[in-house]
């Protein structure tokens, strides 16, 4: 019987109800107090008027005698403790008793100088009189009141937690700062009478609940890479009128197109439940012979991380290998164990009972996304502590994404695209989207940010990547002509020249005079136009590698190694992170990677270099490895198809796309040195094969196959055709053929 009673009383809800009943009873006792009721100080034959009876009469008299009006702190403390017990915010009994005594003494001392007729002694009771007389020996009454008033404030702050108050103050301060900045932007934009550049609000997004057009202001660029050119540059004072295309009239989409966050928040586990889970975890580890202690618990929106400090001599690999056994013993979906960088502990991550889902709008409104120092913000989600995580694609500078079906990879790609669309207009950022599956990125077809319609054919994808390489080389020549090192410095130079109403010309040596031998110079006039960022998005890398693996790998390698300074960045995704898709060359040039849930430890090692991705929960749960090789767990937001459709429809209505036909047009004579069989006709291949046989004097099928980078069967057909046309002889008894064409 005692066991069941003890079990019932140990429940948080039962304790909360008991504390609430006690607090309510004391309130009734104090409010129904009558000075004429029987008590220890008075004996009367009259009937008591206290609502709780004779016990209430004696109790109320004692409370008023000792504490005065400060006795109402006792039921208030019961209500506060009951609320904490109900929500699992447990505090030690010693701390709670100390807080209540401090509040009673402070309040009684403050009320000790007040005289009231309906209660005995004074408003502070005997405790107040004693404390007041004691402290008056050391200071006057004014300082006494201030000191005890401060004590009461500290008590209140202790109960409502310092972190809650500080978070409220920080949020209020950020809100006021944003409002002041928005007001100043409005004032300065109206005072600006000369607009030398298309007015776009790209530094900060003024987000409101209802849509407002972006405030017109001058374009600002990061002040970096302002290097002095090595060669002389000539500036001429001529009128300059920047070219304004139709896509520049497009506006940033309003934040109201995104779904509002849900008001109902998932209730997290209580402190007592977390401690019980930690004890169970230690018991499981002890059963497997692993000794140690848990020094900290970090509860997040999806998982809870237990910081486990193993005993001396315990190998990390031994603990990491117990992840499946721990998940089985604790009846958890999965368990991930990894070393926490900078600490002497292991992070054991267990999923919460209830998972918290959050939308993209909640993260778009955060200061991390609106920070203007982030050039290409990619919203990734929330970390283990629930803090927003926004990465900068310009610093990565390329991103590799992997994950199986249902892991949240496609939603993550959409979140990244939308986060860029909410920051930049078409004149500032352009996209090349390659979608061999013809499903994931088709919703963005027709938006003004695209350089070409969404590419779905592998042959055109290779051509688009070739165009990106040529654009990169062209941008490097343009930046070299004016002596800057990156796209930010180039745009800053152009903006400065436009503001001063000048054009930039430079003399470039083109050769030597055959008669005099003196160098010949040609004057080149620079285009007074900004260079936009170009983001190449490849949704499924595996399909492209099957069709033209060598060509794709070579182009991706070239872009990944050199395109950062030119403002060209790549986001590449795949469902199958195997070594034939993510080759060593690609991994070496993509230091920043994201891994959603994968099927095996081998796939996790392929994408991240270590296991752990197979233990993820799916639905946006990911591991992010930045350029510093530090891996962190992130929970991605959710954006549905309706939100994407609303955003794309708004962008289509606000501006028309200006496609560049050369992005996907296959040139007749490709001098880039990269050829593919899928995008080249048989007649062109045959002519190239004949040229190789004539020049190299080699006619083997394997040599032609390697030279043209085609399959064995196609190379054999080309050799047989040359045999029919009398270019090569039939094979002899050793399999060799004679070349019948004369040498050049």
Curated annotation (Swiss-Prot):
Q: How does it sit in the membrane?
A: Multi-pass membrane protein
List, alphabetically, the SUPFAM superfamilies matched. Answer: P-loop containing nucleoside triphosphate hydrolases, Winged helix' DNA-binding domain
Q: Looking at the keywords, is Cell membrane present?
A: yes
Question: Which residue ranges does UniProt annotate as crossing the membrane?
Answer: 15-35, 62-82, 92-112, 116-136, 142-162
InterPro entries reported for this sequence: FtsK/SpoIIIE/SftA, FtsK_4TM, FtsK_alpha, FtsK_dom, Ftsk_gamma, P-loop_NTPase, WH-like_DNA-bd_sf, WH_DNA-bd_sf
Any GO BP annotation: chromosome segregation
What GO cellular component entries does it have?
A: plasma membrane
By sequence similarity, the record places it as follows:
Belongs to the FtsK/SpoIIIE/SftA family.
Q: Subunit structure, per the record? A: Homohexamer. Forms a ring that surrounds DNA.
What does the entry's free-text domain comment contain?
Consists of an N-terminal domain, which is sufficient for the localization to the septal ring and is required for cell division, followed by a linker domain, and a C-terminal domain, which forms the translocation motor involved in chromosome segregation. The C-terminal domain can be further subdivided into alpha, beta and gamma subdomains. The alpha and beta subdomains multimerise to produce a hexameric ring, contain the nucleotide binding motif and form the DNA pump.
What protein name does the entry list?
Answer: DNA translocase FtsK
* Species per Swiss-Prot/TrEMBL record: Rickettsia conorii (strain ATCC VR-613 / Malish 7)
Please state the gene responsible for encoding this protein: ftsK
